[in-house]
UniProtKB/Swiss-Prot annotation:
Residues 70-80 have a biased composition (Low complexity). This is ATP-dependent RNA helicase TDRD9. Predominantly expressed in reproductive organs. Detected in mitotic spermatogonia, meiotic spermatocytes (predominantly at the pachytene stage), haploid spermatids in the testis, and in growing oocytes in the ovary (at protein level). InterPro entries: DEAD/DEAH_box_helicase_dom, Helicase-assoc_dom, Helicase_ATP-bd, Helicase_C-like, P-loop_NTPase, SNase_OB-fold_sf, Tudor, Tudor_TDRD9. ATP-binding RNA helicase which plays a central role during spermatogenesis by repressing transposable elements and preventing their mobilization, which is essential for the germline integrity. Acts via the piRNA metabolic process, which mediates the repression of transposable elements during meiosis by forming complexes composed of piRNAs and Piwi proteins and governs the methylation and subsequent repression of transposons. Interacts with piRNA-associated proteins PIWIL1 and PIWIL4. It is an enzyme of class 3 (hydrolase). Residues 36-46 have a biased composition (Basic and acidic residues). ATP binds at G157, A158, T159, G160, S161, G162, K163, S164. The keyword Nucleus applies. Disruption phenotype: Mice are viable but show male sterility with chromosome synapsis failure. In fetal testes, LINE-1 (L1) transposable elements derepression and an aberrant piRNA profile in prospermatogonia, followed by cognate DNA demethylation are observed. It catalyses: ATP + H2O = ADP + phosphate + H(+).
Amino acid sequence: MLRKLTVDQINDWFTIGKTVTNVELLGLPPAFPAEAPREEVQRSEEVPNEDPTAQAQVPVKATAPARPASTSGRSLSQRSSEMEYINKYRQLEEQELDIYGQDQPPSGPGLRSPLAKLSNVACIPETTYKYPDLPINRCKEEVISLIESNSVVIIHGATGSGKSTQLPQYVLDHYTQRSAFCNIVVTQPRKIGASSIARWISKERSWTLGGLVGYQVGLEKIATEDTRLIYMTTGVLLQKIVSAKSLMEFTHIFIDEVHERTEEMDFLLLVVRKLLRTNSRFVKVVLMSATINCKQFADYFAVPVQNKMNPAYVFEVEGKPHAIEEYYLNDLGHIYHSGLPYRLEEPVITKDVYEVAVSLIQMFDDLDMKESGNKTWSGAQFVSERSSVLVFLPGLGEINYMHELLTNMIHKRLQVYPLHSSVTLEEQNNVFLSPVPGYRKIILSTNIAESSVTVPDVKYVIDFCLTRTLVCDEDTNYQSLRLSWASKTSCDQRKGRAGRVSKGYCYRLIPRDFWDSAIPDHVVPEMLRCPLGSTILKVKLLDMGEPRALLATALSPPSLSDIERTILLLKEVGALAVSGQREDENPHDGELTFLGRVLAQLPVSQQLGKLVVLGHVFGCLDECLIIAAALSLKNFFTMPFRQHLDGYRNKVHFSGSSRSDCLALVEAFRAWQACRQRGELRRPKDELDWGRLNYIQIKRIREVAELYEELKNRISQFNMFVGPHHPVLDQEYPYKQRFILQVVLAGAFYPNYFTFGQPDEEMAVRELAGKDPKTTVVLKHIPPYGFLYYKQLQSLFRQCGQVKSIVFDGAKAFVEFSRNPTERFKTLPAVNLAVKMSQLKVSLELSVHAAEEIEGKVQGGSVSKLRNTRVNVDFQKQTVDPMQVSFNTLDRPRTVADLLLTIDVTEVVEVGHFWGYRIDERNAELLKQLTAEINRLELVPLPIHPHPDLVCLAPFTDYNKESYFRAQILYVSGNSAEVFFVDYGNRSHVDLDLLREIPCQFLELPFQALEFKICKMRPSAKSLICGEHWSGGAHGRFAALVGGCPLLVKVFSIVHSVLHVDVYRYSGAQDAVNVRDVLIREGYAELAEESYESKQSYEVLKGFFAKSVDTMPDGSVSSPLKDDEKHLLRILLESFASNRLGAPNCKAVLHGPFNPYELKCHSLTRISKFRCVWIEKESINSVVISDSPADLHQRMLVAASLSVNETGSTMLLRETSLMPHIPGLPALLSMLFAPVMELRVDREGKCYTGVLCGLGWNSATEAPILPEHDIELAFDVRLNVEDIVEINILRAAINKLVCDGPNGSKYLGPERIAQLQENARQKLLGLFCRLKPREKITPQWHEKPYEWNQVDPRLIMEQAEPEGSPGKSTSLYQLHTPVVLSP
């Protein structure tokens, strides 16, 4: 035995690779320097092949083997090197066990602890309880004796033998009868299993749930200090043990379903095994399973006894509840006739196999009849109790399909229940209820019912032998759920669900020979196929040595390359520190950072945990907690199959103008919270109705609220608190907060960065035939004479928005939606929704006539001239007219006769966008005459109900005189409407009963109000950040510049009836002031390129006004050909309307809608740069249409999570956020949040041209550390040393709020934290909000992309080491090293 061990010696003793010095052994004389201990000499003789160097070092030293030279940049050797690392660390562990074997605890039965008085004596269970007659009950005393006599016992028994429910009760009753203390924990792999078993026991024993028996699953804990038997999930127990670094809280640990080789299960076994051999040797551990590989587990928990490893005791529970017969497809020849071969590499359920399952369910009535002894059976003679059927399917999609097949069988009297992870507790309970008499219960389940849920009345199991497993793509490390064949172990577990109360039947829907030859025996352990991030963080918290040293002792150790990769990913996220000296970077270990400690305690992914911490840093913790909670659980937004478009529109509404799925979650959650706080959702029905109206699942949003509170509680131990909500006086605060939150999302989800390809403007303009891309979509495969069906086409798009016009042009049609003239320039939501319809593959069908039929029945075939005629249907004017074919995009309103105009501004829409009218004499006279003519007539009320887009007459009072003017209705609200006066450009609220019908003659004159947009200007970064596209300050300044006096405008171009102009203001005798120049000078705006259409219009206008306007042909003059087309068109439309053509007898399927400005996404990381990228259809950004195609600056998208398809060729992005369109934003954010960066310089070394971001370069191996995630960017704005310094200052500001140590952030007061948060916020805003915008440059790509170490070391400006020893900093962000530029 050991004598006089200090605390440090104890810590070193249980840490692999540490040296323990000055140790004396009792009973042995001190060894001379040249003499090895006797036990070790004896051991070396017995194990001659063991490494002699290792023998000489034990027991006083356990040295880790030298780190292999290969790192991430170089390929690892074959499997032999993987086994070498495992064997070396296992040898070290065995050497430690030699010491353990010298001091074994006494074995044998006996109670180890005195009675611990319960706080409530009445809680002591009755010992007269009669246990159910299950196989485990026959060997009750023997099992209890084994458990008390052995440290570890393995119980192997058939499903239904009573292991999970009865055995823990036996131990509890055994201790109670002896008035001895016990505290028993039983793990279950799934929440539903832990909660349902605890509920069943409490009901069976008539105990209060949460008294003697309780459960803890995730956030929910139903237990008290009196609880002596608690069921919990594997993860909950693991978290408890890792935090305590001991098992001593419990007397007995039952680990159920150990055959389910999840990552948590394997790590729990590792930790329990480790602690059993160190500081928790009196705890009893029981492993249980129906399909366990007993020898593997027994050897794993072996202990040294007299220099031999003694396996753990295995106890076989004899007997099964009832016999279970197995059948395969070969045995079902009477209902299965397909001869399709089954292939291991193609797991799939074919339609005929679904039909086999349905046929089986129908046949069970005959089987029940035969077993009951009845000779006849009729439809009316159903027995009152029909046995239940459990069907195992791989996922929710398959469950829904099978559910639909079964619900169509109404006459068969079936009650069908789905059972999967997203089912609520109430829905889960339905599975356990008895069916209505005469009905058969059918349970459609994923593998959740394989082991976690036992439905006692199941007699039939139908198993498709499939499952979905989470795997990691080998190249990208992104996860994907893959359909695969279930293992024989899992299928046997499923079979065991039958036969609980009577003889059972199991039908495996695969051929018998396929089962024998292809189905794998065991499932591949998760530790060998899934990310190890959370496991390695827990290893670091345990502080028992290098992760590879501890994981080498796992039941199925992960490969060294997987450990190495996970360590690098944890360094990338910031959970482990990046070494300041890159050559010292240990690819197998790292220092745990403050962030890493937080992540290890949070029940969310590493990136979501980082989101919470960065939210704390930048003062948006509340929003980040909501997002982290929402993204960790099932999405509470619902998009029903038939109402997907409505659900999508609702989600877009919640996101506002942010274009962020994450911000939509925040706004929806807060809207729900606000309604509850106002008392609007007191009744459950009111809350459910609110959820249905807003496409939100109430049960799921409640779960988010619970997790939000849990996260809030957990981070409080790290001195992070959600601050009180004070009223904010700064009007720009909400916009700044939104931007900061978007930046925090980018920081948390680095490197999930994406950009968009640029559309070809010239091709897009041609494809749209000059139509406005912000209001128009294109349809293809239009049938001949498509204009006849314009009403059908209008109705197809009714759910998108108000259709203004449809232009039919051969086999194409252009659908244009109405734009509110008082809203800013942007792609209409209707256009996004229309393109979304195409993405959802919504069928667009028209009921049509054959072209030959039309030509044969109307005008003797003369209408054939209209077959290729371009026709415009104007719903506003209610006209259908032929159009002249034109390829000219020039839009020249007849109201503009000169390029210089004097105007009055009547309505400012936003900065640079306004309405006005000309104030020259000619126009003033025209408006005066028009007003007089309108007001001379006897006006009549509207014949139809007012609706948006309707043109009518509305009153307006000017100089105390009320007159009627032409107006367009914008909105209708109650008894009033907002109208827009189309000849002046202003708007007003008018009572509905004051609106009048407009006579037809007043619709012919073009509207005289003009819409203007200042050319070559866009909002600055400051305006984008501090407002809704433009800041409040910019709005105020622009309104002051254009209001109160006439303006001179110089027309640059006319695009889609909008005049792009330069605006000049005269003030007194001074020269004219260019409004754009003022806004740029004051930092509200910056110069921008005009679009291709605008530049084309400029050239045409320049030539047009160079000639005499009088010599130009008048496009309004009618030609005889056009009149003839009009006549034929009218005849054809009348024939169609009067049904002379008869009922349509054909269907035409249209293709589209399309918009040529729709953007495609691509990744910025090296590994994914050329992979196809898809955004999930539920995301707001599943449709992105360019608002400013002339702006060539990169637009950035951030994804919260990524997955890949089964081949790894396509990436799927989830929960995306479109970042503000700020020049240089992708580069600045990448440099701000990258662990390491290397700047690129031009050939002369005078300016920075780009940056390479990632984990950097290892000079020792001469290879990049994590090349797959490297991001190469070329700057599109000029960045200099000052920008790099600003980024470093901001990184240092972040570090101050997330640091360890005695002066760390855990010990800061609230005032100091608030001060540091405000400092970080201001530094962040200052990085982007500059008075003078960064200069735009043409991107120059580096000649050696993704190559590190390209800078001359003499030009690198080394940063001062942070506080602490060099290279040992645990800061979240290291400071970047700028490159010295030549003068």
